[in-house]
Amino acid sequence: MLRLYALGAGVACIALAILVQGLLPIAIPESRETRATRAVRNELGEVKWVWHEASPYTAPEELGRRVYQREGCWYCHSQYVRPVAGESQRWGPVSEVGEYAHDRPHLLSTRRIGPDLTRVGLKVSDHWHFAHHWAPRDVVPDTIMPEFRWLYRKARVPLVDGAERPALGASDALRAIFTFRADAPIPLYPSPDGLAFAAQTDGTPVLDVENLPAPYDRPETWRGRTLTIVAPTDELRGLVAYTQKLGTNRGAWRDAFEPQALAVSVMSIPQTEGQVDRGRVVYGRRCAGCHGVEGDGNGPVATFLDPRPRNFTLGSFKFRSTPSGSLPTDGDLYRTLTRGVRWTAMPTWHELPEKDRVAVIAYVKTFSPRWQEERPEPAIAIGDPPPTTPARLARGKTLYAQAKCAECHGEGGRGDGPAAAGLRDDSRFPIRPTDFTRGQFKAGGDVRDLYRTMTTGLDGTPMPSFADSMTDDERWAISAYVLSLSAFRDPLTGAPLSLDEAARARLNAPDAGRFASPRLALDPTAPPDLAGQPKALVRFHKGILGEGR
């Protein structure tokens, strides 16, 4: 009899599992939801929320998803921002059903041995991921993530004496990786231990050590050495593309993410011995992998990164509220550290304790003698921006052409101007103009951030200051126009979103309170009087989460 009871209990449990985990989810209407609330920037530069179809994976992203499953990434990484205290402040907006419309199977996972990846898309550049999969502990020292070096193509190449500098020796392994097109040189910047990364392979690899910091800029440093040259396989490119896709069906949510909206220009950080000592420890754990132990921007994974990490020994900083040529304020450094630098390998560090952020800034200031010899000039005053109107945007477009912004950034703002390919920073490394259509502004996505950049310039780059050549009003107009180039576009691809004119008009309406959160997202399919009303996102947990979560 006991065996019969046990058998019946087993069958009942199996049936219950099939019902709860198989049949009920299919029956729930939310399981067929293909839309999610998406943050979009309207033409006025404001971030509004709208219900929008989730986009499917591209072929490379699908390949990457299969690699993600095969390599067991989902064993440690979850893909679900839970509706509990603190999750939305740490990771981003709470997950919605529609985000997973194209996931077969779902990879929600339950364990978080590694970080949750729901919102990892566009947090850092592709190049950061290339470095991370090759040498995880050089990027995140306390990680337990293993290396995935079988996802790279590799060649060991001896160096030979060239006419003026070392050159790559002949190698069949190298020819198996690169096409050796004569009109497409691919510069290689080796790390101190002889590792060189190439993101592209359709061209001719060329060793370039002249721009590296001393002593690695000297030919004799490399004489007789053998380099390890690595390039990503199609599987790794797909894995990175899949990773960058995660969370982007929620659009430009980072521009409305409170922890990254820090605005500060003036603060004073004590340069005490204890502060510097603490900063040295933080720097060694969080920064040295990219910026190098000496702060020269030549860390062990710097070869993977484009743009290159900042060389702190030069005392030149891009993102400042001080005039061109001046050192930044402590507040500028704190803002950059907290926000990160979008679409580069510099992540946001808003989760790092404030004491650690303050301390590492004090330590970074020990790398260059400029900090002992000079004081930052006073920060520029940035008031409230003028209202953005169609007339102001039209004026900004005219000024954009007159100021020859298109020479670098292109007429459509895609970063494809005629001068773009030849641009170099002060260290002679290639540097790409920003693609405005994707809204990934390195100094921040608010019109004040763009105005600050227009006024101060970006030291160490070809981006000049327009403080003397343009009036305040002209700089505000260009800033508003540049911001509008990313209106109603996908931040991942820069492609226009499928929103009709009526929906765009409602999102452009100058009413700051409407459509300002996922809970109040515009539903283009609803009648106009109900379009921005709260909508229950998780119907079957109403009693726990509340209406409209």
Feature map (PLM): residue ranges:
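Sequence/structural segment immediately N-terminal to covalent heme-attachment motifs in c-type
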Residues: 56-79, 93-96, 273-293, 388-414, ...
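Inter-heme linker and motif-flanking segments adjacent to c-type heme-binding CXXCH motifs
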Residues: 246-253, 272, 296-298, 343-349, ...
